[in-house]
From Swiss-Prot:
GO terms for molecular function: structural constituent of ribosome. One of its GO terms (biological process) is translation. It comes from Neisseria meningitidis serogroup B (strain ATCC BAA-335 / MC58). HAMAP family: Ribosomal_bL28. Transmembrane segments: none annotated. Belongs to the bacterial ribosomal protein bL28 family. The gene is rpmB. Residues 1-26 are annotated as: Disordered. Keywords: Ribonucleoprotein, Ribosomal protein. This is Large ribosomal subunit protein bL28. One of its GO terms (cellular component) is cytosolic large ribosomal subunit.
């Protein structure tokens, strides 16, 4: 399963670990993904999404119906 948020599209990015001696080694910054179930009142069912914490805030703000409509418009749900 890819580490990609279904709503925001956030995915891992690369960067460096930097030691006190300023040595640099490559690392990955992973998105804060959560598997959550959302109750969709209009469809009277649960929807399971793997979303980032930022997407959870978006869903709280605009509502799950708006987010699902956007996903369906993009052809992802």
């Amino acid at each position: 399963m890819a580490r990609v948020c279904k709503v925001t599209g956030k995915r891992p990015m690369s960067g460096n670990n930097v030691s006190h001696a300023n040595n640099k080694t490559k690392r990955r910054f992973l998105p804060n993904l959560q598997s959550r179930r959302f109750w969709v009142e209009s469809e009277n069912r649960w929807v399971r999404l793997r979303v980032s914490n930022a997407a959870l805030r978006t869903i709280d703000k605009v509502g799950i119906d708006v987010v699902l409509a956007d996903l369906r418009a993009r052809g992802e749900a």
